[in-house]
Amino acid sequence: MDTESTYSGYSYYSSHSKKSHRQGERTRERHKSPRNKDGRGSEKSVTIQAPAGEPLLANDSARTGAEEVQDDNWGETTTAITGTSEHSISQEDIARISKDMEDSVGLDCKRYLGLTVASFLGLLVFLTPIAFILLPQILWREELKPCGAICEGLLISVSFKLLILLIGTWALFFRKQRADVPRVFVFRALLLVLIFLFVVSYWLFYGVRILDSRDQNYKDIVQYAVSLVDALLFIHYLAIVLLELRQLQPMFTLQVVRSTDGESRFYSLGHLSIQRAALVVLENYYKDFTIYNPNLLTASKFRAAKHMAGLKVYNVDGPSNNATGQSRAMIAAAARRRDSSHNELYYEEAEHERRVKKRRARLVVAVEEAFIHIQRLQAEEQQKSPGEVMDPREAAQAIFPSMARALQKYLRTTRQQHYHSMESILQHLAFCITNSMTPKAFLERYLSAGPTLQYDKDRWLSTQWRLISEEAVTNGLRDGIVFVLKCLDFSLVVNVKKIPFIVLSEEFIDPKSHKFVLRLQSETSV
């Protein structure tokens, strides 16, 4: 019978075989493969998550998956062990943490530097027309000609144009940053440079022709400020075209393939740089792709390792270092055993499907009974006073034990236990009770894997990405480009294809060609 060890303070289980005690100790040591928060294991370190997001079940991603069938009475053999080490760290973890800190510091500096430059330039743009109008009033007010009705109308026009420019600039440029990219946006940088040169040229002309000569025609000075504001508005229109409208027309089709399981999606994009296209791919990945589950890959790895471990090579000529000959012998033996391996795979998958269907049926029945109990409690609470009514959280805690065992076994069988903590299940159950959802609506999250956004962020296993491309990431997309988005456990391979040019011709059909004459004879029966 399988036994499990639970470390106090953390949800950590290790599976033991039903053989001798010594073999169980070896299995325990082998199964204590570390997992950090992002799901990456290391042979030299152990990283334990904080108990805030304690999973409902053990994180079996370090185990070899379905090597042994769990006994249904595992709950009666659970042993609590205390006094164990809670934290451990290796030199690899220290190096990785220091590298992440350096990268984060560099990204923060770059982000704040860009924001500072953009803010300074924006402040300069909005203060320049106001300074053009106020400086003559401050320096040579007595020498200026009086401002007539037309001049005052120009001042009102400048005020409203500056207000429109302020709102448009805030809406286009001062939006919350969605991601940190390795390079700057080329068009945005060009627009900032253009605005800077434009404002500097206006200041030079203003200093030479107006400040030095002390121009007395105040109307011309106001008209000069109006021309500056008009030019800034046109630059803002140009920014809208380059940054927003240019990318709306689809020009390329991107095929995104996940390297581990081959799941793929297709997206249509317009003229974008490689790094901006990567951002679009990642934003769609979190809502379109099912969450990455490394536990589903352990069964095939274990089967291949077991298949090769059963092969031994004997050298009848004596000891030698002929590694090439041994490798060839192993490959030949594996090829001879290949004929029977498909039967093993077939029966393993059939047995797994049988267990999944069995435990799914038990889970569905348990959840339906729990929701029937909730409906009965709600009918009873309608007759109680308002102070005695149970809230959805208390109702969820009341019925959860009746379905916990069936849900636990199903999640372990489908290897989803590390994505669902007990707290998240209770919150989802309380949400379903509050909105009067059916048992099927509650089970939909657990019966099939959903997109990444459906789960907590600490279960995503992919928060930091690296963009790998043979070309500069600021270059635009073109046909045949391949770039890779890599995280800790898997990567997304993106293949760019240009949408083909379609030739559509028109063929006119004369409406008279569809007409026909039905001639009836006297003998014809209609």
Swiss-Prot record:
Pfam families listed in its UniProt record: Strabismus (PF06638)
Example of a GO biological process term: pigmentation
Superkingdom, taxonomy of origin: Eukaryota
InterPro entries found in the cross-reference section: VANGL
Bias (Polar residues): 75-87
Signal sequence bounds: none
TM region(s), chain numbering: 115-135, 154-174, 185-205, 225-245
Keywords: Cell membrane, Membrane, Phosphoprotein, Transmembrane, Transmembrane helix
The keyword Acetylation is assigned to this record: no
Entry GO CC: extracellular region; lateral plasma membrane; membrane
Topological domain spans for side Cytoplasmic: 1-114, 175-184, 246-526
Subcellular location: Cell membrane
Region (Disordered): 1-87
Membrane-protein topology: Multi-pass membrane protein
Membrane-side (Extracellular) residue stretches: 136-153, 206-224
Compositionally skewed regions (Low complexity) per UniProt: 1-15
Residues annotated with Phosphoserine modification: 88, 90
PANTHER family, A to Z: VANG-LIKE PROTEIN
Record-stated family: Belongs to the Vang family.
Subunit text: Heterodimer with Vangl2. Interacts through its C-terminal region with the N-terminal half of DVL1, DVL2 and DVL3. The PDZ domain of DVL1, DVL2 and DVL3 is required for the interaction.
Protein name: Vang-like protein 1
Organism: Mus musculus (Mouse)
